[in-house]
Each structure stands twice: as structure tokens, then as C-alpha cells.
């Protein structure tokens, strides 16, 4: 995400940053030339004349006034933009786009402000993200560009404009800080106040709104596909020191972006990536550490892809609609025809606005404006601002009776239900039109339509039992921003219909028939408001540590692990206290018997299996105890050995891995704790098991030693002292093989010693071949040039030395051929051993070329291996560049000789 989005510029901007000030008020600061400057000289053309101080002050005041006027003008522009965004609907889209482009976007500062307003609006109203994305597309094409002409990009890519760059920069900032505002409330130890609950809900809406907005912009190619993939990877990856159950916010954002832009990303070229994403989502979906809501969100998203990205009907109609579309949906869904507005000067609800209409009714309707002409006000919910004036689920029939007792749950007037709102004339009119029957049978009609609800529900809910008639409420759902314990005044708390249980669409009834959508005469079941239960505050750190001590002491005495686990679970400890609780478990068992230490280790493993603690919790606890070692050693001298036992048992029970344990102990931290842990592992298991596990961990043993000891010889010495040299059989071989060759250089003796002391598995190991060749080369060099001789590496060796070198190499030929024959990869390793040997000897004159020729003539190394060494680009072995320079001409000859031989064979 970081590198991909960074093309948009800085991730933060404000009114004072960027180039916005270049078009601000002109500021004049005239220079004053002192008398000494032009003394005896004629001022040049560029010299500025002296200006009286009074004129300067007047210019300064003028600049300040201009600056204030400029600020007022900007504020007026931003107010106008805010007003345009509040009125934005699909019907007025083109008209309002033109208005927005004509508000006076004449500087980068104003453009930044416009972008901030659009993004904030899109984040507050995620349902209308697609509309705001269309607006951004229009502005990206038509808004002024203040960056100047850019270099031509690749064909097919959208040109980067100021608007697009600043928009991506703002979205990057929101994405990187997506959970900041939500985490502020989640980290509170005390229960949130109602106002804080509402603020947290608003912050979460904005977080999800930003993700959805990014997806909608991605649909329109305003954000490149690579950026979308980086967003998804960022949301999916497991962060260090972050528990899985704390990834809920990121996974919810992931589901949002997948639902929004998943179909666009799921094409043939990106199929492998998408498969990886969804494989990870499937594994997370089965994790018990995640909340059930997040697991179901992941399941819905996985099922959405399985159904070829065709959403259930419940999610189809959530976007912004025109008024004509709403009228058509009303006809399809409920069989109610809402006529379009009549000619100018007339209203579609003529009879409701006539002279016989009661004054109270007019007063109730007038303030609503626009939508009141169609539906009236929705009961129990606000209309909202901007595009949000359209509720995503409504019933036109219900909207017309907002003051009725059955809908509001209380009586506000003495008049009967029909007449209480429309008056006597209105009631007669309704009865004459058959609307009274429509009104009273609505509940019954709704119940009959609920039978087809399963197609709108997720598969996991389709087998649940049907709703009883008395459990259905016709009141629309309250705003989700309200606190769970809050209930609107004068309205009892009642059972709500789940969104997926809304009535499915039905065909329009035949002409002349009255739609049967009336209410039952029985009022909906009213549940009594549950008594408020005061939430018990979480225990303090001191209380938790005391409880932990009690539970652990009892467990060590009784040995009942289940009771101990239940005791820890019942503490309901905040997650940030868990490491200290585990530290307490370890410390309490340190001065006890080995059996009690093993019990404590088992308890920690059980807490991990039950999902109460995590591997990170254990590592933090373990390191906390290590930091206390100087104090603990006063009473418990062998504390590090005991802690090594805890670490070893944690590795055996797969609570942590060797690499996870090694990371904080690098560079000899708490030395020799890591080696003590390996000793305990070898003791509790066996050497072969530990060797295989250690090799898989890829831990660099030299880095685990203090810096002064980080070399092969010292490492082997330390490992032998701890009885751990078996972990590096080749390292031990390197030292002993050279000693054996010096003792008896005959090839038969060397080969027999290798067979007796080296495992057959290692005979085809590159490391073994490297050590074998290095030992031979070191022996030959020591014999030809004894250490006592002060020979210059730049001088050529004598004929006697060259002959001795060749004879020694010839004597080792049978052993070399035995292990290198028909193994080109091992032969390449032998050449690298020669390269490193020459590098360590400062490349003696002609040595590398001589040995290349000897290896070739003696048929120890094949032509294919020489050429493979030349083409190999590994950086593992030093001196490759200089080595190539010395033998390049000979390798070229070898290639041409091979070609000539192949041509002769062809002839």
C-alpha cells in the first residue's frame, strides 16, 4: 500500500501545505537601498528606489486586508461546495457537477479543500460511495490541473492530475490510520459512555466507508489495480505482536473491499493471487479466536465468490436511486402506485392539501418538503442530509400514517386512528377509496410474504425456524448509532424484523383489485424493557496477580488443570495483562520441584489451546522474567537453567518455535540461555529430532553468540563445551579431516576414515564437498609453501613447487572422483571451494588457472561444471569477480573447443 499509493504525493496535507499559497494575496516587501550602496555610483536598472515608510505601512495593511478577504472568499467557496454535496442525488448529478466545477477552483489550496469535503462526505455516507466516486471521476477529468504538463505515461493508463494525486494521498492517509479512532475507544478499560459509543460507531462507519470508497474508485480505474492488491495484502497479513482476535477491524475492511471491487480483481491474470487471498480467508473463517460476527462476514464473502460475485437480493438495492426508480420499486414490491408530480402549480396529493384538510395536517407535512410529497416521514427514524435523505428500506404505506397509535406505540390524539390524522373528511375519503382496508390488513399481508424470505438470507440461516406472528414488529429499525441501552422516548422496546426478513418483491395486482397489504387488528407484541444491569468493571492489575497466585498455588498442590484453566477464564482479564499473569505463573514455580515446573508449563500450553493466551503472550512473559534474572539469581542461582526448561517445553508443545525464541536472544543476549534451551531439548527428546528441527528453523548459530565469539572456530569450541557439536557435523568434520590428512595423506586411509566417521547422507551434501576440497587445498598449499617460508603471493612459484603441487593433487584424485563423479552440482561446489581458497590467500599468481587446468586434464571436473560455475550469479562466496577475470580467457577457449568437437562429431 505504502509504495503504490505514494505516487499521489505526501500522505498528509492541510490548508497551509503544498503550492496553495502561490495564488494567495500579493505581498509586497520593497527593499530599501542604504546610502552606502550607491555612494558615488549610478544605481542599475534592477535597483529598487527608496520608498517612504508610510507607503510601506500602507502596502502592508493592504496585503493583510487582501489576505483576510482571500480567506473569506475561500470559506464562501467551501460553504457552497458543502451545499452542493448535500443536494447531490443521481437525478441532479450532471447539473451539480457543473455547479461544483464553477464554484471557483482556481488554486491548489481550493482543490485540496474540495477533495477533503468530498472524501469526508463519502466516509460519512458509505451507502452513496458509488455516487461520490462518479463525482471524483468527473472532477479528475474536468478539474483544473496545477501540476503542469507531465511526462507521457504508458498507453491505457490514466494521466496523473493534481486532483487524482491529492485524492489518492488523502485516501492513503485514511487507510494507514484506519483503526486509530476506533482503537482509542477499544483500549478503554472502563465501559464506554453513550456519547463515546456513538463516537466509536461513527469512527467505524468512516473506516469502512473509506475502504468502500477506495473500492468504488477502483471500479472506475481512478485507483490502479496494484494499489487495491496492496490494500488487500495489508489487511490480510498477520502483524507482529498482534493477536488474531485483534484483527477483526482489518478483516471487516477486507470483506468490504472484496464485496465492492472483488469482481473487477477476479480475472485470469490475478486468479492465483485471489485464490491465495480466499484460501487465507477460509482458514481465518475456521479460527475460534475471531469473533463470530467476523467469521460470518468472511463466510459471506467466500460464498459471494463461489456464486460468481452475484450478491443476494438483500444487497442488490442499497445504492442511490432516482425518484422514478423508487416509484417503480414501490409498485413492484408493495403494489402501491405513487403518481408522479402533476403540472406546474398542482400537487399529486391534491386531496390531502385541499381546503377541507385540517390545519394540523398541513402543518405536519409542510416542513418535510421533497420526500413528504411522496411518502411522508418515516416513523421512528430521521431523514438525514445530502444523498442520505433516501432510506434504504421503507414502506410507502407505513410512511403515510406516522401519527397512528399502532406505528408509534402511543396515542397522541383523542380522535380515532383514521380520523386522528386526516380529520373527518380525510377518513371518509380513505374509506371511499378502500385505503382503510389496506391500512388494517398490512400486517397480515406482510406475514404472508415472509414465507419467501429464505432467498434473501445467508445459507447458514436458511434452516432456522420461522417467525411467529406475534414476534413481528412493523416499526423500522432504529439508527445503529444509538446506544444499545437507549430507547427513543415514548416508544416501547419491541422485537425488530431482521433486514433479511423484509417482504420479497411481488407482482403488481391486476387492474381494479385493491392490494391486500393491511394490518392485523392485533397490535404487535411489546416486550418489557429489560432492567438495566450495571456492568462490573474489569479487575485491576493487582487483583489479577493475586487471583493468579491463588489459582496457580492451588493447581500446583492439587494438579487439577481444568479447574485452573476455568479459574483463569473466569478472571476475564484484559488482554494486555495476560503477559504479566503468565510471568507470575513462571516465577511461582521456579523455586519448586521439577514436577511443579512441568505442571506450570502444561498449564500455559493448556491456556494457549483454550484460546485464553497466545504465543506472543508467552514470549512477552518469558522475556519479562528474563529481565528479572539478576534479582531472581540471588535466591535461585540456577534460574536460567530453569527458564531453559520452560522454553524447551514450550517448543515441544509447539507454543513457540525455535526461531521465535532465538530472535530476542541474538548477539548473545542472556547468553548462554539459548544453548541451555537446546541442551534441554536434546535431553527431553533426542539428538536426531533436535538436529532436524534446528536445521528447519534456519537459525544462524553464530549470531546467537556474543559478538567477540562470532567465528567458526570459537563457535565449534563453545558447542563442544555444551555437548551440542552434533548440530553441526560438517563444522566438526572441517577441523578433524584436515588433521587426518596431515596424519596420513594416503587416499585409501582418507577414504576409509570418511566412510567410518561421516554419515552416508552427507556424502552428497554440497557442504561436505566444500569442506573436503578445502581440506585438500589447504594441505597442498601448506606442503608446497610451508608457513615458515615468506613467499610473495605475486611472484610465480618455481618449477619444483609446480610439480609437487601437481603430484599431490594427483594423489587425491581417486578420493575426489569418488565423491564428485557424475554430480555436476557437487563439482560446482568444488570450484567454489577453490575460489574461496584463492580469495583467502589473496589470489596467488596463476594458482586459480593452474588448478582449473589440472581439474580439467585429470577429469576431476567436467566441462559442464566449469561453464555452470561461470554462469552462476550467487553472492554466497566471495571473490567471484576477480576469479572470473583470471580464468575468463581459458573458459572462452573451453567453450570454443567444445563447439569444434561437436562440429567434428557432426561431420
UniProtKB/Swiss-Prot annotation:
Residue stretches of biased makeup (Polar residues): 503-516
Domain MIF4G positions: 78-308
Phosphothreonine modified-residue sites: 89, 508, 514
Expressed in which tissues: Ubiquitously expressed in all adult tissues examined, with high levels in skeletal muscle and heart. Also expressed in fetal brain, lung, liver and kidney.
Region of interest called Disordered, as start-end residue ranges on this chain: 1-71, 498-541
GO-annotated cellular components: adherens junction; cytosol; eukaryotic translation initiation factor 4F complex; membrane
Record keywords, A-Z: Acetylation, Initiation factor, Isopeptide bond, Methylation, Phosphoprotein, Protein biosynthesis, Repressor, Translation regulation, Ubl conjugation
Domain MI: residue ranges: 543-666
Chain positions with N-acetylmethionine modification: 1
Record cross-link Glycyl lysine isopeptide (Lys-Gly) (interchain with G-Cter in SUMO2), residues: 575
Pfam families named among the record's database cross-references: MA3, MIF4G, W2
Modified residues (Phosphoserine): 11, 395, 443, 902
Gene Ontology MF terms: cadherin binding; mRNA binding; RNA binding; translation factor activity, RNA binding; translation initiation factor activity
Entry comment on modification after translation: Phosphorylation; hyperphosphorylated during mitosis.
Residues bearing the modification N6-methyllysine: 431
PROSITE patterns recorded: MI (PS51366), W2 (PS51363)
SUPFAM superfamilies: ARM repeat
Modified residues (Omega-N-methylarginine): 360, 505
Ranges for domain W2: 720-904
Listed GO biological process terms: cell death; negative regulation of autophagy; positive regulation of cell growth; regulation of cell cycle; regulation of translational initiation; translational initiation
Family under the similarity heading: Belongs to the eukaryotic initiation factor 4G family.
Complex formation: Interacts with the serine/threonine protein kinases MKNK1 and MKNK2. Binds EIF4A and EIF3. Interacts with MIF4GD. Interacts with DAZAP2.
Function recorded in the entry: Appears to play a role in the switch from cap-dependent to IRES-mediated translation during mitosis, apoptosis and viral infection. Cleaved by some caspases and viral proteases.
Miscellaneous note of the record: This gene has been shown to be extensively edited in the liver of APOBEC1 transgenic animal model. Its aberrant editing could contribute to the potent oncogenesis induced by overexpression of APOBEC1. The aberrant edited sequence, called NAT1, is likely to be a fundamental translational repressor.
Name the UniProt record assigns to this protein: Eukaryotic translation initiation factor 4 gamma 2
Organism (species): Homo sapiens (Human)
Amino acid at each position: 500500500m505504502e509504495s503504490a499509493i505514494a505516487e499521489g504525493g505526501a500522505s498528509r496535507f492541510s490548508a497551509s501545505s503544498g503550492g496553495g499559497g502561490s495564488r494567495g494575496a500579493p505581498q509586497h516587501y520593497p527593499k530599501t537601498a542604504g546610502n552606502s550602496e550607491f555612494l558615488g555610483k549610478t544605481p542599475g536598472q534592477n535597483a529598487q528606489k527608496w520608498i517612504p515608510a508610510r507607503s510601506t505601512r500602507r502596502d502592508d495593511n493592504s496585503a493583510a486586508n487582501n489576505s483576510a478577504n482571500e480567506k473569506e472568499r475561500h470559506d464562501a467557496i467551501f460553504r457552497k461546495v458543502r451545499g452542493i454535496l448535500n443536494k447531490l442525488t443521481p437525478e441532479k448529478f450532471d447539473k451539480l457537477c457543473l455547479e461544483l466545477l464553477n464554484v471557483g477552483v482556481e488554486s491548489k489550496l481550493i482543490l485540496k479543500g474540495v477533495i477533503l469535503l468530498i472524501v469526508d462526505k463519502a466516509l460519512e455516507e458509505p451507502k452513496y460511495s458509488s455516487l461520490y466516486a462518479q463525482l471524483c471521476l468527473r472532477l479528475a477529468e474536468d478539474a483544473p490541473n496545477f501540476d503542469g504538463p507531465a511526462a507521457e505515461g504508458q498507453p491505457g493508463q490514466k494521466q496523473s492530475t493534481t486532483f487524482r494525486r491529492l485524492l489518492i494521498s488523502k485516501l492513503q492517509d485514511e487507510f494507514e490510520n484506519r483503526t486509530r479512532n476506533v482503537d482509542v475507544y477499544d483500549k478503554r478499560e472502563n465501559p464506554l459512555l453513550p456519547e463515546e459509543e456513538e463516537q466509536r460507531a461513527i469512527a467505524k462507519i468512516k473506516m469502512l466507508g473509506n475502504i468502500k470508497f477506495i473500492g468504488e474508485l477502483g471500479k472506475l480505474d481512478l485507483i490502479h489495480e496494484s494499489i487495491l492488491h496492496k490494500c488487500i495484502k495489508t489487511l490480510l497479513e498477520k502483524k507482529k505482536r498482534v493477536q488474531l482476535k485483534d484483527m477483526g477491524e482489518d478483516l471487516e475492511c477486507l470483506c468490504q473491499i472484496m464485496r465492492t471491487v472483488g469482481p473487477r480483481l477476479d480475472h485470469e491474470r490475478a486468479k492465483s493471487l485471489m485464490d491465495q487471498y480466499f484460501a487465507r480467508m477460509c482458514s481465518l473463517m475456521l479460527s475460534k479466536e475471531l469473533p463470530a460476527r467476523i467469521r460470518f462476514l468472511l463466510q459471506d464473502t467466500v460464498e459471494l465468490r463461489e456464486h460468481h460475485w452475484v450478491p443476494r437480493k438483500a444487497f442488490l438495492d442499497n445504492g442511490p436511486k432516482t425518484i422514478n426508480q423508487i416509484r417503480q420499486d414501490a409498485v413492484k414490491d408493495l403494489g402501491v402506485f405513487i403518481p408522479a408530480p402533476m403540472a406546474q402549480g398542482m400537487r399529486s396529493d391534491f386531496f390531502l392539501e385541499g381546503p377541507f384538510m385540517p390545519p394540523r395536517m398541513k402543518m405536519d407535512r409542510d416542513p418535510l418538503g421533497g420526500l413528504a410529497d411522496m411518502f411522508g416521514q418515516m416513523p421512528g427514524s430521521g431523514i438525514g442530509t445530502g444523498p442520505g435523505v433516501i432510506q434504504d428500506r421503507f414502506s410507502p404505506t407505513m410512511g403515510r400514517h406516522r401519527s397512528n397509535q399502532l406505528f408509534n406505540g402511543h396515542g397522541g390524539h383523542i380522535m380515532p386512528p383514521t380520523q386522528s390524522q386526516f380529520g373527518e373528511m380525510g377518513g371518509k375519503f380513505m374509506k371511499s377509496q378502500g385505503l382503510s382496508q389496506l391500512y388494517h390488513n398490512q400486517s397480515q399481508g406482510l406475514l404472508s410474504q415472509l414465507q419467501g424470505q429464505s432467498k434473501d438470507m445467508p445459507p447458514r440461516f436458511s434452516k432456522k425456524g420461522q417467525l411467529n406472528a406475534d414476534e413481528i414488529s412493523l416499526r423500522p429499525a432504529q439508527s445503529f448509532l444509538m446506544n444499545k441501552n437507549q430507547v427513543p422516548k415514548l416508544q416501547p422496546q419491541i422485537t425488530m424484523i431482521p433486514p433479511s426478513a423484509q417482504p420479497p418483491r411481488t407482482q403488481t395486482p391486476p387492474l381494479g383489485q385493491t392490494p391486500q397489504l393491511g394490518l392485523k387488528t392485533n397490535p404487535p407484541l411489546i416486550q418489557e424493557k429489560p432492567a438495566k444491569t450495571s456492568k462490573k468493571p474489569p479487575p485491576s492489575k493487582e487483583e489479577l496477580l493475586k487471583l493468579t497466585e491463588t489459582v496457580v498455588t492451588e493447581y500446583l498442590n492439587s494438579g487439577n488443570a481444568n479447574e485452573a484453566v476455568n479459574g483463569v477464564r473466569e478472571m476475564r482479564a484484559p488482554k494486555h495483562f495476560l503477559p504479566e499473569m503468565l510471568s507470575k505463573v513462571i516465577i511461582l514455580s521456579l523455586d519448586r520441584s521439577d514436577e511443579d515446573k512441568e505442571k506450570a508449563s502444561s498449564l500455559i500450553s493448556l491456556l494457549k489451546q483454550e484460546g485464553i493466551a497466545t504465543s506472543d503472550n508467552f514470549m512477552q512473559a518469558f522475556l519479562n522474567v528474563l529481565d528479572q534474572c539478576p534479582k531472581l539469581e540471588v535466591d535461585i542461582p540456577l534460574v536460567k537453567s530453569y527458564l531453559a526448561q520452560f522454553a524447551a517445553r514450550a517448543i515441544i508443545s509447539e507454543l513457540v518455535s525455535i526461531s521465535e525464541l532465538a530472535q530476542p536472544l541474538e548477539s548473545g543476549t542472556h547468553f548462554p540461555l539459548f544453548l541451555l534451551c537446546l541442551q534441554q531439548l536434546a535431553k527431553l527428546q533426542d539428538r536426531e529430532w533436535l538436529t532436524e528441527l534446528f536445521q528447519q528453523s534456519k537459525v544462524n548459530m553464530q549470531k546467537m553468540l556474543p559478538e567477540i565469539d562470532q567465528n567458526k572456530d570459537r563457535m565449534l569450541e563453545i558447542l563442544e563445551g555444551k555437548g551440542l557439536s552434533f548440530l553441526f557435523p560438517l563444522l566438526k568434520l572441517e577441523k578433524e579431516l584436515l588433521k587426518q590428512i596431515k596424519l596420513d595423506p594416503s587416499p585409501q586411509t582418507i577414504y576409509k576414515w570418511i566412510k567410518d566417521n561421516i554419515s552416508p547422507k552427507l556424502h552428497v551434501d554440497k557442504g561436505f564437498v566444500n569442506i573436503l576440497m578445502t581440506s585438500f587445498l589447504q594441505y597442498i598449499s601448506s606442503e608446497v609453501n610451508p608457513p615458515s617460508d615468506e613467499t610473495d603471493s605475486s611472484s610465480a612459484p618455481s618449477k619444483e613447487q609446480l610439480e609437487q603441487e601437481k603430484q599431490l593433487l594427483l594423489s587425491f584424485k581417486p578420493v575426489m572422483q569418488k565423491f564428485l563423479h557424475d554430480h555436476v552440482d557437487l563439482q560446482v561446489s568444488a570450484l567454489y571451494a577453490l575460489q574461496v581458497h584463492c580469495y583467502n590467500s589473496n589470489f596467488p599468481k596463476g594458482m586459480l588457472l593452474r588448478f582449473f587446468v589440472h581439474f580439467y586434464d585429470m577429469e576431476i571436473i567436467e566441462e559442464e561444471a566449469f561453464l555452470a560455475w561461470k554462469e552462476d550469479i550467487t553472492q554466497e562466496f566471495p571473490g567471484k569477480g576477480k576469479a572470473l577475470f583470471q580464468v575468463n580467457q581459458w573458459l572462452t577457449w573451453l567453450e570454443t573447443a567444445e563447439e569444434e568437437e561437436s562440429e567434428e562429431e557432426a561431420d
